C-alpha cells in the first residue's frame, strides 16, 4: 500500500510539470496566430505583443538565446509577463494523476494531432481574411522568426522534460526496488521463522509419536500378559469351585450326624430331668426353710439385746436430765435472790441520796398526771423524751414474784422508775438516773398482768447535793455454758444470759464538763426497752413454778 501511494504522489508531480509546459506552449501558439491575422490598422499594436511574446522564449531556453545580446535584454524585460502567464496557466489547468512517461507521450501526441487541424483551420481563416485584407512581408518575416524560435524552444523544452522524467523514473524505480527488497527480506525472515518453528514442531511431533508408539507397545504387552493371567485365573477358580463343592458335601454330612446325635441327647436329658427334678425340689425346699428359721431366730435375739441396752441408756439419761433440771432450778432461785438483794441495796442507797430532792419532783409529776387525767392521750412535750418509747411491758405476774424480802425489793424496784423525768433549762450541769428494769418470765399456767409504763428519770444538778458523784454499773457473768435444756424456759434480756454475780463499781466525780456533755444532759437519750429484748427460748416447762430475771443499771452523776 505504501508503494502504491508513493507511485501516485510521484505521478502527480510529473504530470503537473508536463501539463504546465504543454499548456504554456499551446497558449503561446494561439496568441501568435491571433496577432498574426489582424487588420492593417492594428498591425502596429499587434507587433508589440508579438515582440513581448518573443522575449519570453529566451527566458525559458537560455542556451539558445545566449548568442544574441539583444535578445538577452529583451528576455529580462519580458520575465514578469511570462511568469504571470505561466502561473495563470498552471492554476487553470486540471491535474490528473498518471504515469509520467505515458502522460508525456499521450499529451504531446494529442497536441501534435490537434495542432495541424487548428493550423489548417487558422490558415484557412487567414487566407480568407488575407483575401480580404492585405498582409505585409514584414509581418510574415516576423511570424517566421517567431515560429523558428518557438520550434527551437519547444525542442529544448521537450528534451529537458524527457531527461527530467527519465531521472525521476530512475529514482522512483530505485525506491520501489528498495522497498520491494525490504518487503522481500521481511517476508523471507518471516518464512524462515515459520520454517524453524515448523521444524521444531516436527521434532516435537516425532518425539510424541515415538512416545505414543512406546505406550502402544507397552499396552499391547500388558494386555497380552493380562490375557494370560485371566486364563490362569479362570482355570484356578474352576478347580477351586470343584474343591469347595467337595468339602461342602463332606461338611454337610458331618452336620447331619451332629444334629442327629444332639437330638438323641436332648431326648435322653429331658427324660432324666423329669425323673430327678421331683426328688431334688423337695430336698432343696427343706434345706431353705431350715436355714431361714435359723436366721430369723438369730436376728430376733440380736434385736432384743439391743433394745434392752438402749432402754437402760434412756432411763439413765432421763435421770440425769431430771437431776440437772433440779440443780438448775435451785441455781436460778439462788441467783434471783442474790440479784434482788443487790438491787434492793442499790435502790435504798439511791433513795437515801435523792430523798429530799425527789419529793418535789414526785409531787410535780403527780400534779401533771392528775391534770392530764388517767386516760389522757399524751404527755407534756417539755419533758425532752421520746414518748413513743416511754412505755414498756414490765408487768410480772403476782404469783411468780418471790415472797418475803424479795417481794418487797421487787416492789420498790418497780415503783421507783415510774417517776417522771424533770429537766431544768438553765442548768449548766446535769445528772441523770437511768434505771431500766426488765423482768421476763415463762410459765405454762401463768396469766400476764396489766402493763405498767415507765420513763427514765432526769435529775438536774440543782436537785442534787453538790460535790458528790455516784456511778454504779451492774454486770452479770454466766456460770453455765449449756444453751439447750429440756423441760425449762429462760427469758433473756438483750444478749446477757442469767447472771451469776453482781459487780458494783464506783467512779470518781467528773468536774469538767464540755458542751456535748451539757447538751446530752439537757437532751437525754431515751431508752427503748423493746429493742433490747430478745426472744426467749423454751428449755422445758414445769407447772406451778415460774422463773424471773431482772437486770438494773444505775448511773448517778453529780
Curated annotation (Swiss-Prot):
User: What cellular component GO annotations does this protein have?
Assistant: centriole; centrosome; cytoplasm
Where in this protein does the record put region Disordered?
1-25, 53-102, 364-400, 532-558
For the modification N6-acetyllysine, the affected residues are: 522
Q: From the UniProt record, list the Centrin-binding (CBR) repeat ranges.
A: 126-157, 215-246, 247-279
Coiled coil, from the record = 175-209, 300-340
Sorted UniProt keywords: Acetylation, Cell cycle, Coiled coil, Cytoplasm, Cytoskeleton, Phosphoprotein, Repeat
| Record-listed Phosphothreonine modification sites | 23
Q: Where, subcellularly, is it found?
A: Cytoplasm, Cytoskeleton, Microtubule organizing center, Centrosome; Cytoplasm, Cytoskeleton, Microtubule organizing center, Centrosome, Centriole
Segments of skewed composition (Basic and acidic residues) = 1-21
What biological function has been recorded for the protein in this entry? Essential for the assembly of the distal half of centrioles, required for centriole elongation. Acts as a negative regulator of centriole elongation.
- Similarity comment text for this entry: Belongs to the POC5 family.
Protein name per UniProt:
Centrosomal protein POC5
What is the native source organism of this protein? Answer: Mus musculus (Mouse)
Q: Gene for this protein? A: Poc5
Amino acid at each position: 500500500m505504501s508503494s502504491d501511494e508513493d507511485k501516485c504522489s510521484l505521478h502527480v508531480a510529473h504530470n503537473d510539470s508536463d501539463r504546465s509546459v504543454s499548456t504554456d506552449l499551446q497558449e503561446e501558439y494561439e496568441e501568435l496566430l491571433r496577432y498574426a491575422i489582424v487588420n492593417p490598422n492594428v498591425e502596429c499594436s499587434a507587433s508589440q505583443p508579438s515582440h513581448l511574446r518573443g522575449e519570453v522564449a529566451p527566458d525559458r531556453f537560455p542556451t539558445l538565446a545566449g548568442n544574441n545580446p539583444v535578445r538577452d535584454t529583451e528576455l529580462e524585460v519580458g520575465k514578469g509577463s511570462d511568469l504571470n502567464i505561466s502561473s495563470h496557466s498552471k492554476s487553470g489547468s486540471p491535474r490528473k494523476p498518471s504515469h509520467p512517461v505515458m502522460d508525456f507521450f499521450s499529451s504531446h501526441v494529442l497536441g501534435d494531432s490537434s495542432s495541424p487541424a487548428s493550423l489548417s483551420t487558422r490558415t484557412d481563416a487567414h487566407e480568407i481574411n488575407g483575401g480580404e485584407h492585405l498582409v505585409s512581408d514584414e509581418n510574415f518575416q516576423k511570424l517566421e522568426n517567431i515560429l523558428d524560435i518557438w520550434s527551437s524552444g519547444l525542442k529544448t523544452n521537450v528534451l529537458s522534460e524527457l531527461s527530467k522524467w527519465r531521472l525521476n523514473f530512475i529514482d522512483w524505480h530505485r525506491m520501489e526496488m528498495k522497498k520491494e527488497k525490504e518487503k522481500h527480506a521481511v517476508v523471507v525472515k518471516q518464512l524462515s521463522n515459520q520454517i524453524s518453528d515448523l521444524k521444531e514442531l516436527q521434532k516435537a511431533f516425532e518425539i510424541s509419536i515415538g512416545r505414543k508408539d512406546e505406550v502402544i507397545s507397552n499396552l499391547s504387552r500388558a494386555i497380552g500378559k493380562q490375557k494370560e493371567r485371566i486364563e490362569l485365573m479362570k482355570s484356578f477358580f474352576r478347580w477351586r469351585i470343584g474343591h469347595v463343592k467337595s468339602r461342602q458335601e463332606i461338611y454337610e454330612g458331618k452336620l447331619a450326624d451332629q444334629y442327629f446325635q444332639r437330638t438323641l441327647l436332648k431326648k435322653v436329658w429331658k427324660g432324666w430331668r423329669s425323673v430327678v427334678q421331683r426328688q431334688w425340689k423337695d430336698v432343696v425346699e427343706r434345706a431353705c426353710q431350715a436355714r431361714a428359721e435359723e436366721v430369723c431366730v438369730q436376728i430376733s435375739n440380736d434385736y432384743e439385746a439391743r433394745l434392752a441396752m438402749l432402754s437402760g441408756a434412756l432411763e439413765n439419761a432421763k435421770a440425769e436430765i431430771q437431776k440437772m433440771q433440779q440443780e438448775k432450778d435451785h441455781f436460778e432461785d439462788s441467783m434471783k435472790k442474790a440479784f434482788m438483794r443487790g438491787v434492793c441495796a442499790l435502790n435504798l442507797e439511791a433513795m437515801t441520796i435523792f430523798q429530799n430532792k425527789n419529793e418535789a419532783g414526785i409531787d410535780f409529776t403527780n400534779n401533771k398526771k392528775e391534770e392530764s387525767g388517767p386516760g389522757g392521750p399524751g404527755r407534756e412535750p417539755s419533758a425532752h423524751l421520746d414518748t413513743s418509747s416511754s412505755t414498756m411491758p414490765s408487768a410480772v405476774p403476782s404469783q411468780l414474784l418471790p415472797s418475803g424480802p424479795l417481794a418487797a425489793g421487787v416492789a420498790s424496784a418497780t415503783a421507783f422508775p415510774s417517776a417522771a423525768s424533770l429537766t431544768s433549762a438553765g442548768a449548766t450541769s446535769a445528772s441523770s438516773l437511768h434505771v431500766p428494769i426488765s423482768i421476763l418470765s415463762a410459765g405454762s399456767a401463768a396469766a400476764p398482768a396489766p402493763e405498767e409504763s415507765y420513763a427514765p428519770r432526769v435529775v438536774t444538778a440543782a436537785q442534787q447535793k453538790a460535790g458528790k458523784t455516784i456511778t454504779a454499773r451492774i454486770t452479770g457473768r454466766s456460770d453455765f455454758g449449756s444453751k439447750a435444756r429440756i423441760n425449762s424456759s429462760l427469758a433473756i434480756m438483750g444478749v446477757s444470759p442469767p447472771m451469776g454475780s453482781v459487780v458494783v463499781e464506783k467512779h470518781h466525780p467528773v468536774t469538767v464538763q464540755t458542751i456535748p456533755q451539757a447538751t446530752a444532759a439537757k437532751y437525754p437519750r431515751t431508752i427503748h426497752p423493746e429493742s433490747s429484748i430478745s426472744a426467749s427460748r423454751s428449755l422445758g416447762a414445769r407447772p406451778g413454778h415460774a422463773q424471773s430475771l431482772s437486770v438494773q443499771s444505775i448511773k448517778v452523776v453529780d
